[in-house]
Amino acid sequence: MNVKKYQKQYYMPPVPCMDWAKKDSIEKAPVWCSVDLRDGNQALVIPMSLEQKVEFFKLLVEVGFKEIEVGFPAASETEYEFLRTLIEQDLIPDDVTVQVLTQAREHIIRKTFEALKGCKNAIVHVYNSTSYAQRQQVFKKSKEDILKIAVEGAKLLKELTEEAGEKYRFEYSPESFTGTEPEYALEVCNAVLDVWQPTADRKAIINLPSTVELSMPHVYASQVEYMSKNLKYRNNVVLSLHPHNDRGCGVSDAEMGILAGADRIEGTLFGNGERTGNVDIITVGMNMYMQGVDPELDFSDMPKLCHAFESFTGMSINPRSPYCGSLVFAAFSGSHQDAIAKGMHWIEEKAPDTWTVPYLPIDPTDIGRNYDADVIRINSQSGKGGVGYILETKYGLNLPAKMREAMSYTAKSVSDHLHKELRPDEIFELFKDTFENVTTPYNINGVHFKQLDEGRIEAQVTSNYEGGEYATVYAEGNGRLNAVSNALKQQYNLQYDLVSYTEHALEQSSSAQAIAYVGIKKPDGILSWGAGVDPDIIRASIDALVTAINNR
């Protein structure tokens, strides 16, 4: 790799612009403009059909976008037809403004206005490239020539809007802003604003595209702050950003840019777009949400959004994509699962006003996800907290702590052997197969009790070993389970101590099943566990004891 062929291609403002760094958070949502139907669509291997675009447009409206870029109508007949379809079929709500893109070239601008006939609310977005590299290599024009292109385009927009009797809003982008000298970008933008003369009731949009991301985010923020402080008509200008993600910092560019004075963000759902994509509006919006700031977009049914996006575009969402990927809430690590399980119990008990569960930046249910399928996931790395949480929340089994540990070792061993994640139903079946009502090699066929003096109990226990003949033994104890345990020890010369016993109902009704958990300790100190399920809690406890013995 020849690193010497590369150098910085960005330009810092002529004066320090770091006021944005004094702020630690975004306080309100910007104006959002979706460019999914333009930047997103043109980046697809197979662009969307007219029908898919219409459905995508409806989805964006449903999410809450009030400004939607619908295409470059002069660029192709398909994009022209799409805009005409939206207008002629009256698909644009009164509170939604469509945005159309045009180069600062006369015939393209005129074609764009032709496509807009009959549109009630529109933003006409004109652009030309201003960067040093494009001036030198692509257009071979001077700064004065490039400025003239922008001004002439701005004049034509104003002229055609007046001729049409419309009140379209105007937007200008110095394309490749990040590779443009800030002083020159400011000069061009102010010249355009001088043409448009924006007012409080008809503001102009100045859009600063990170067409190609060239710097660290703080550099972009400083460039944005410089523009915000020095633009003419600033109170009547909506300062917009259009970040791309070439260096993987699109979200940071947007967030720091808002701190630096930006009022508006252009981006896409899930970060779709050319090369590495546009800024992901979902991530920026949800980052605000998790700090208590309303993004003013509805992401409450994220699975629906994901499905629709993949259906329309043919793209797949990365499993690790923030907030929307299939694994973003998943915890496989044992310590993480334990912390989440304890955090969830704390939330249930304390009912606090704010969400603070470890490892979960937001409540997954806020965006249509669920704990069972999305949060606690079991594989060979998982621990007792995760296994216990699944068995308790999904199946109502409140295992003793040490039994949860034993069950987690069993689950991890199976997962490791099969090289796969275990689903909740597979974990439940594994628990039943391993710890519930195991009747081999020892099995009890019948038990009868007799009350003795001083609270003692006599048990008549009929049992067999490995399918052999049944034998009946009598033994005493200080309780029913203790008496049965003594009978089994006597019959089979077993050595263990009964060290743990808990029970609870599995349902809230008079005929509910009960479950008992029994732990025994062998002479070598190893614990063995069993569970018994039966409507009769005495029978359930006996089955649990037998299972623990069989699991030695």
Where are these predicted regions, by residue range?
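N-terminal capping/small domains of soluble enzymes
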Residues: 1-106, 370, 375-378, 382, ...
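A mid-to-C-terminal "edge-of-domain" accessory segment
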Residues: 1-38, 292-474, 510-513
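Alpha/beta enzyme core
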Residues: 6, 32, 46-67, 83-89, ...
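Short, small-residue-enriched loops and turns at beta-alpha junctions
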Residues: 39, 43-44, 73-77, 131-133, ...
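Short beta-alpha connecting loops at secondary-structure transitions
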Residues: 134, 208-210, 238, 266-274, ...
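Catalytic alpha/beta core domains of metabolic enzymes, predominantly
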Residues: 215-348
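Positively charged, aromatic-enriched nucleic acid-contacting surfaces
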Residues: 459-463, 506-529
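Mixed-charge, glycine-accented linear interaction segment located at domain edges/termini
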Residues: 526-529, 533-552
